[in-house]
């Protein structure tokens, strides 16, 4: 009986491994002191406000932020910046961008070289015209299907296999799909047919 119980426990532990991995993947690591200080410094620079309390009204005046290479892991610290239009978050440690859904005035967003596997959080950003999200691990583009104002989209260096979410983005004039090793040539052909006016860069291997 003891051996049976141990065997059942082992089976259950195997079954739980995918769930544990998923939980680990989805867990958002809070920004450390260095990242928080970098965010505040950039906000103060944009406002020309070196000292004093940063109020909600202050945050509403920020139109652009350059937060490249600031060791940011949690974009939740940006939720108050509801009027920001240009946001650079390249080369950070971000794998969850769901909090960006609050920033609905964004027109240009740069998320290159992070740890993203999906585009959740972008669905509500209907003013977005320029999106650079290359050098991630993207597989799911479903959140992009309603971003019909997009003109420029860089999806290079990801893990894409399905481009169907892009077929109705009729204003796109630049689409970079290079270095997605699992992207079938048939998918690229479908997008070329759906978006005949778009300049598409691709080197499919399948």
Q: Which residues are covered by each model-predicted region?
A:
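Per-repeat structural element of leucine-rich repeats
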Residues: 73-74, 95-97, 117-119, 139-141, ...
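N-terminal/domain-start segments enriched in small and hydrophobic, helix-friendly residues
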Residues: 155, 162, 166-177
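N-terminal capping/linker segments that flank leucine-rich repeat
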Residues: 2-86, 99, 121, 170, ...
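Low-complexity, polar/charged sequence tracts that form flexible coils or short amphipathic helices
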Residues: 78-80, 100-102, 122-124, 144-146, ...
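Conserved hydrophobic beta-strand positions in leucine-rich repeat
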Residues: 65, 87-89, 109-111, 131-133, ...
């Amino acid at each position: 009986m003891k051996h049976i119980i141990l065997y059942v426990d082992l089976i259950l532990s195997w079954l739980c491994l995918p769930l544990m991995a998923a939980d680990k993947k989805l867990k958002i690591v809070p920004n450390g002191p260095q990242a928080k200080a970098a965010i505040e410094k950039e906000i103060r620079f944009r406002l020309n406000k070196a000292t004093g309390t940063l109020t909600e009204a202050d945050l509403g005046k920020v139109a652009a932020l350059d937060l490249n290479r600031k060791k940011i892991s949690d974009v939740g610290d940006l939720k108050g910046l509801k009027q920001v239009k240009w946001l650079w978050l390249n080369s950070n440690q971000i794998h969850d961008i769901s909090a960006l859904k609050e920033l609905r005035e964004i027109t240009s967003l740069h998320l290159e070289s992070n740890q993203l596997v999906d585009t959740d959080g972008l669905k509500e950003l209907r003013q977005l015209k320029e999106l650079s999200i290359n050098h991630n691990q993207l597989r799911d583009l479903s959140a992009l299907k309603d971003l019909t104002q997009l003109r420029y989209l860089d999806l290079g260096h990801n893990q894409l296999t399905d481009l169907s979410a892009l077929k109705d983005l009729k204003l796109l004039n630049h689409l970079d799909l290079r270095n997605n090793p699992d992207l079938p040539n048939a998918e690229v052909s479908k997008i070329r047919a759906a978006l005949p006016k778009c300049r598409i860069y691709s080197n499919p291997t399948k």
